[in-house]
């Protein structure tokens, strides 16, 4: 009987995966058709504003909407959005936060972007109404070249604005299928807080498509395994943007980018619905761990009815990206280079305290190093009559654990340096961080002993949670730290000493690169790319294949010809040349070094 049930479940999953693949292939065909029909002016407009994204991620209607939106200019902010933004600044207690989340959670799929000084950001929240899957993506770009020109006073408002938009976008799509408003708003709040804590963490975990026609799918994703509906492009933003529903902002070269994806899946069973105030959120699993979210509930924690407590799983991923590189997720260049590289080498270790389980791993492929911190957070059931004291403590504990995870992640990155880390050393580091950052009680019942400092640095001062209002105030404001800074080659781990705040731009310094990275070659500028020859598909091009996307040229395709005579789809080679200065096939320089330096 059990075998038949498991077989049925497996067949359903396979069917869902096949449908998802077919849907993506249809969208990919629509993408190429859309690009083929664009005028050269419209193509440049969308390319320069990073609105094309990745083939298969967006529908043709969505791409057309982006084009129309960028032509018309950014829409004026509605009174409701203004009120939401104003209210978010004033939110300092749990009740008002829940009320605010309830008021915006059904607004719809949203995209937010902005720029101030040397920082630009974009955030997108999307929900699949069929599966209940929720994705939130947030990316920040810091232009190091202009870093010294931007004052701290300029950067702080940008940080605050980012947190407000972040909360709004993540909360709006949080729980459309939730059993009750309060049940849905609370996970939304948890999601929002997690997203705020994470600002810049890149994503990508390996999901391979069934056929090799377009390599855009073969990129790592920080998405949990599940049946998915394609989201808007989210990759590095504004340059790496395939799951973001992008709207604008060119990314300056020499920027450091990071990305964060939070994947939340509602799993509300019949008995759970009876427990009215359930945090209806159960994170899907991290593919790198291969552990289902249904197994993530702490064994030490049990509900009154003996059911597994719900959990939230956060996959925080960091990729070290050199300045000037235009990486669409894993990026075309990275995938091409990886063909001749050794397979992944991964170091992983776990720790668990008080029901909060963390898994850390580091992998390297094609010269790109990826750090992953997975946090599984158990959440207790609460009454849907409003926030109780227990709930406030639970949310405080959750925030604390998120910040702790960031501290551990940063320590892992910095202690790793450029050498192979020792698993035993890493484990000791985690244990030390765990002891410093507190042990959140299961479900957040008793968290007063937890320290909210997320820095594992021995010199960092622990941050005590003196009151729930302080923590809420910090989470609402998102973080008012100054602009990210470069401490040079030997930087200490980041310390979170702001009282109750989640410092967005302090996290950015994780990814500001060492001085020797400045010598790495950069891609071509848009002007240099536009100066290369471009032509339309001809009869002689039939049966020829673009070496970047592994797709045959078809009627209407636009091709770009490099000085070495090799040709590619214009949108494929333009993306490649944004991060490389050589031909993908023969590796000859597209421009002489003198010409490159004169423009770059």
From Swiss-Prot:
Annotated signal sequence range: none
Enzyme class: transferase
Pfam families listed in its UniProt record: zf-RING_2
Gene Ontology biological-process entries: negative regulation of transcription by RNA polymerase II; protein ubiquitination; random inactivation of X chromosome; ubiquitin-dependent protein catabolic process
Protein origin, superkingdom: Eukaryota
Ranges for region Disordered: 1-24, 49-355, 417-497
Designated name of the protein: E3 ubiquitin-protein ligase RLIM
InterPro entries attached to this UniProt entry: RING_finger_E3_ligase, Znf_RING, Znf_RING/FYVE/PHD
Pathway assigned to this chain's UniProt record: Protein modification; protein ubiquitination
Family: Belongs to the RNF12 family.
Modified residues (N-acetylmethionine): 1
Reaction equations catalysed: S-ubiquitinyl-[E2 ubiquitin-conjugating enzyme]-L-cysteine + [acceptor protein]-L-lysine = [E2 ubiquitin-conjugating enzyme]-L-cysteine + N(6)-ubiquitinyl-[acceptor protein]-L-lysine
One Gene Ontology molecular-function label: zinc ion binding
Induction comment from the UniProt entry of this chain: Expressed at higher level in female compared to males cells (at protein level).
Keyword Zinc-finger carried by entry: yes
Residue(s) carrying Phosphoserine: 163, 194, 227, 229, 269
Organism annotation: Mus musculus
ZnF (RING-type) intervals: 546-587
Basic and acidic residues bias locations: 1-11, 213-228, 322-332
Function, as annotated: E3 ubiquitin-protein ligase that acts as a negative coregulator for LIM homeodomain transcription factors by mediating the ubiquitination and subsequent degradation of LIM cofactors LDB1 and LDB2 and by mediating the recruitment the SIN3a/histone deacetylase corepressor complex. Ubiquitination and degradation of LIM cofactors LDB1 and LDB2 allows DNA-bound LIM homeodomain transcription factors to interact with other protein partners such as RLIM. Plays a role in telomere length-mediated growth suppression by mediating the ubiquitination and degradation of TERF1.
GO cellular component terms, semicolon-separated: cytosol; nucleoplasm; nucleus
Keywords: Acetylation, Metal-binding, Nucleus, Phosphoprotein, Transcription, Transcription regulation, Transferase, Ubl conjugation pathway, Zinc, Zinc-finger
CDD domains the record matches: RING-H2_RNF12
Chain intervals with Polar residues compositional bias: 103-131, 140-152, 166-175, 244-255, 333-349
């Amino acid at each position: 009987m059990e075998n038949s049930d498991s077989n049925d479940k497996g067949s359903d999953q396979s069917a869902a995966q096949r449908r998802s693949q077919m849907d993506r292939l249809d969208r990919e065909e629509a993408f190429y058709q859309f690009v083929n029909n664009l005028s050269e002016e419209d193509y440049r407009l969308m390319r320069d504003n990073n609105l094309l994204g990745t083939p298969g991620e967006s529908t043709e209607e969505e791409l057309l909407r982006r084009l129309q939106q960028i032509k018309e200019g950014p829409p004026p902010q509605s009174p409701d959005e203004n009120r939401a933004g104003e209210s978010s600044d004033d939110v300092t207690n749990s009740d008002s936060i829940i009320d605010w989340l309830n008021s915006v959670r059904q607004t719809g799929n949203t995209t937010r972007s902005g720029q101030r000084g040397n920082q630009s950001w974009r955030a997108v929240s999307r929900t699949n109404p069929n599966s209940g899957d929720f994705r939130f993506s947030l990316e920040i770009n810091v232009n190091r070249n202009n870093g010294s020109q931007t004052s701290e006073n300029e950067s702080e408002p940008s940080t605050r604005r980012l947190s407000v938009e972040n909360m709004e976008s993540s909360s709006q799509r949080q729980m459309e299928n939730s059993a009750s408003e309060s049940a849905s708003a609370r996970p939304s709040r948890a999601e929002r807080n997690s997203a705020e804590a994470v600002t810049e963490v890149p994503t990508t975990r390996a999901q391979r498509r069934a056929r090799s026609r377009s390599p855009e799918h073969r990129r790592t994703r920080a998405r949990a395994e599940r049946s998915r509906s394609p989201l808007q492009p989210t990759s590095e933003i504004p340059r790496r943007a395939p799951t973001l529903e992008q709207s604008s902002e060119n990314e300056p070269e020499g920027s450091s980018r990071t990305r964060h994806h939070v994947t939340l899946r509602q799993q509300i069973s019949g008995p759970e619905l009876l427990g009215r105030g359930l945090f209806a959120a159960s994170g899907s699993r991290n593919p790198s761990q291969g552990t289902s979210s249904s197994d993530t509930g702490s064994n030490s924690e049990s509900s009154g009815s003996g059911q597994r407590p719900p959990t939230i799983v956060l996959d925080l991923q960091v990729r070290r990206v050199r300045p000037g590189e235009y990486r669409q997720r894993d990026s075309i260049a990275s995938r091409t280079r990886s063909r001749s590289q050794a397979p992944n080498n991964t170091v992983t270790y776990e720790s668990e305290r008080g029901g909060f389980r963390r898994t850390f791993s580091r992998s390297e492929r094609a010269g790109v190093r990826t750090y992953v911190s997975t946090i599984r957070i158990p959440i207790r059931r609460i009454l849907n009559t409003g926030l109780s004291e227990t709930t406030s403590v639970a949310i405080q504990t959750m925030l604390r654990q998120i910040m702790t995870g960031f501290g551990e992640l940063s320590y892992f990155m910095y202690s790793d340096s450029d050498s192979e880390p020792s698993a035993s050393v890493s484990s000791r580091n985690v244990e030390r961080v765990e002891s410093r950052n507190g042990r959140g009680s299961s479900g957040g019942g008793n968290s007063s002993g937890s320290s909210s400092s997320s820095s594992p640095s021995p010199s960092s001062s622990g941050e005590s949670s003196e009151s729930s209002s302080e923590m809420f105030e910090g989470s609402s404001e998102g973080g008012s730290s100054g602009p990210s800074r470069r401490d040079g080659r030997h930087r200490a781990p980041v310390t979170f000493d702001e009282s109750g705040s989640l410092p967005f731009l302090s996290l950015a310094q994780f990814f500001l690169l060492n001085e020797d990275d400045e010598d790495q070659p950069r891609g071509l500028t848009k002007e240099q790319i536009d100066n290369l020859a471009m032509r339309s598909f001809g009869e002689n091009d039939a049966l020829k294949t673009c070496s970047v996307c592994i797709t045959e040229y078809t009627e209407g395709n636009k091709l770009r010809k490099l000085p070495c005579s090799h040709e590619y789809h214009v949108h494929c080679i333009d993306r490649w040349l944004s991060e490389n200065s050589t031909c993908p096939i023969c590796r000859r320089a597209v421009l002489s070094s003198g010409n490159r330096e004169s423009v770059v």
